[in-house]
A protein has these predicted regions:
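N-terminal Rossmann-like dinucleotide/flavin-binding domain of flavoprotein oxidoreductases
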Residues: 42-99
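Short Gly/charged-rich anion-binding patches and loops
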Residues: 17, 36, 64
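FAD-binding core/adjacent interface of flavoenzyme oxidoreductases
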Residues: 1-7, 25, 76-125
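Glycine-rich Rossmann-fold phosphate-binding loop(s) that bind the pyrophosphate
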Residues: 9-14
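Flexible, glycine-rich phosphate/dinucleotide-binding loops
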Residues: 15, 38, 56, 114-115
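Glycine-rich FAD pyrophosphate-binding loop
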Residues: 7, 24-43
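Gly/Ala-rich phosphate-binding loop of Rossmann-like dinucleotide-binding domains
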Residues: 19, 23
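Glycine-rich, flexible loop/turn motifs
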Residues: 37, 43-52, 113, 119-120
Length: 125
Protein backbone atom coordinates (compact mmCIF):
# COMPACT_ATOMS: atom_id res chain seq x y z
CA UNK A 1 0.00 0.00 0.00
CA UNK A 2 1.40 3.36 -1.03
CA UNK A 3 1.52 5.96 1.74
CA UNK A 4 0.71 9.61 1.04
CA UNK A 5 2.60 12.29 2.90
CA UNK A 6 -0.59 14.10 3.91
CA UNK A 7 -4.27 13.17 3.95
CA UNK A 8 -6.62 16.14 4.10
CA UNK A 9 -10.24 15.60 5.07
CA UNK A 10 -12.43 18.44 3.86
CA UNK A 11 -12.67 20.48 0.65
CA UNK A 12 -13.62 23.87 2.01
CA UNK A 13 -11.19 26.80 1.85
CA UNK A 14 -8.93 25.42 4.61
CA UNK A 15 -8.70 21.93 3.10
CA UNK A 16 -8.09 23.20 -0.43
CA UNK A 17 -5.45 25.64 0.82
CA UNK A 18 -3.71 22.87 2.78
CA UNK A 19 -3.72 20.58 -0.28
CA UNK A 20 -2.29 23.27 -2.54
CA UNK A 21 0.41 24.22 -0.04
CA UNK A 22 1.40 20.59 0.51
CA UNK A 23 1.60 19.88 -3.23
CA UNK A 24 3.65 23.02 -3.93
CA UNK A 25 6.07 21.88 -1.23
CA UNK A 26 6.54 18.53 -2.95
CA UNK A 27 4.30 16.39 -0.75
CA UNK A 28 1.96 13.66 -1.95
CA UNK A 29 -1.64 14.45 -1.05
CA UNK A 30 -4.89 12.56 -0.52
CA UNK A 31 -7.77 15.07 -0.52
CA UNK A 32 -11.13 13.75 0.73
CA UNK A 33 -14.38 15.64 0.27
CA UNK A 34 -16.93 16.82 -2.24
CA UNK A 35 -15.82 17.73 -5.77
CA UNK A 36 -18.34 20.55 -5.48
CA UNK A 37 -16.26 21.90 -2.56
CA UNK A 38 -18.01 23.68 0.30
CA UNK A 39 -21.72 24.38 -0.11
CA UNK A 40 -21.32 27.32 2.28
CA UNK A 41 -18.71 28.76 -0.06
CA UNK A 42 -20.68 28.30 -3.28
CA UNK A 43 -23.79 29.90 -1.72
CA UNK A 44 -21.93 33.03 -0.59
CA UNK A 45 -23.28 36.09 -2.37
CA UNK A 46 -20.15 38.19 -1.83
CA UNK A 47 -16.83 37.46 -0.16
CA UNK A 48 -14.92 40.54 0.91
CA UNK A 49 -12.26 39.07 3.19
CA UNK A 50 -10.27 36.75 0.91
CA UNK A 51 -6.81 38.23 0.26
CA UNK A 52 -6.29 39.50 -3.27
CA UNK A 53 -9.84 38.83 -4.42
CA UNK A 54 -12.08 41.62 -3.15
CA UNK A 55 -15.78 41.40 -3.95
CA UNK A 56 -15.70 37.91 -5.46
CA UNK A 57 -18.76 35.73 -5.05
CA UNK A 58 -18.61 32.24 -3.60
CA UNK A 59 -19.26 30.41 -6.87
CA UNK A 60 -16.40 32.30 -8.57
CA UNK A 61 -14.05 31.54 -5.68
CA UNK A 62 -15.01 27.86 -5.75
CA UNK A 63 -14.25 27.76 -9.49
CA UNK A 64 -10.86 29.37 -8.85
CA UNK A 65 -10.15 26.72 -6.18
CA UNK A 66 -11.13 23.92 -8.58
CA UNK A 67 -8.93 25.35 -11.34
CA UNK A 68 -5.96 25.58 -8.96
CA UNK A 69 -6.49 21.95 -7.88
CA UNK A 70 -6.69 20.90 -11.55
CA UNK A 71 -3.53 22.79 -12.52
CA UNK A 72 -1.61 21.10 -9.70
CA UNK A 73 -3.21 17.73 -10.53
CA UNK A 74 -4.67 17.24 -7.05
CA UNK A 75 -7.63 14.86 -7.34
CA UNK A 76 -10.50 14.90 -4.87
CA UNK A 77 -11.51 11.53 -3.46
CA UNK A 78 -15.23 11.55 -2.72
CA UNK A 79 -15.06 8.42 -0.57
CA UNK A 80 -16.36 9.07 2.93
CA UNK A 81 -13.70 8.75 5.62
CA UNK A 82 -15.23 6.56 8.33
CA UNK A 83 -12.27 6.43 10.73
CA UNK A 84 -8.70 7.59 11.22
CA UNK A 85 -6.33 5.41 13.22
CA UNK A 86 -3.00 6.47 14.72
CA UNK A 87 -0.68 3.60 13.82
CA UNK A 88 2.56 4.83 15.37
CA UNK A 89 4.60 6.35 12.56
CA UNK A 90 1.64 6.87 10.24
CA UNK A 91 -2.17 7.07 10.12
CA UNK A 92 -4.65 4.59 8.69
CA UNK A 93 -7.57 6.23 6.88
CA UNK A 94 -10.62 3.98 6.61
CA UNK A 95 -13.17 4.42 3.82
CA UNK A 96 -16.11 2.08 3.13
CA UNK A 97 -14.05 0.01 0.70
CA UNK A 98 -10.37 0.70 1.43
CA UNK A 99 -7.74 1.40 4.06
CA UNK A 100 -5.29 4.11 3.02
CA UNK A 101 -2.15 5.41 4.72
CA UNK A 102 -0.68 8.85 5.30
CA UNK A 103 2.19 10.18 7.37
CA UNK A 104 0.05 13.14 8.53
CA UNK A 105 -3.65 13.98 8.60
CA UNK A 106 -5.28 17.39 8.47
CA UNK A 107 -8.92 17.59 9.56
CA UNK A 108 -10.54 20.51 7.73
CA UNK A 109 -14.19 19.64 8.12
CA UNK A 110 -15.39 23.18 8.66
CA UNK A 111 -17.82 24.25 11.33
CA UNK A 112 -21.29 23.08 12.20
CA UNK A 113 -23.74 25.92 12.19
CA UNK A 114 -26.26 26.37 14.98
CA UNK A 115 -29.96 25.92 14.45
CA UNK A 116 -30.94 28.15 11.55
CA UNK A 117 -33.73 30.65 11.52
CA UNK A 118 -36.68 29.71 9.29
CA UNK A 119 -35.41 29.45 5.67
CA UNK A 120 -31.89 30.53 6.73
CA UNK A 121 -30.32 27.28 5.53
CA UNK A 122 -31.28 28.11 1.91
CA UNK A 123 -29.71 31.56 2.13
CA UNK A 124 -26.48 30.83 4.00
CA UNK A 125 -23.23 31.54 2.25
Amino acid sequence: MERADIAIIGTGPAGVSAAITAKVRGKTVLLFGSRELSSKLTKAHKIQNYPGLPDIDGAQLAQAFKKHLDVLEIPITEKQVTAVYAMGGYFGIQTPDAMLEASSVILAGGVVMGKPFPNEDELLG
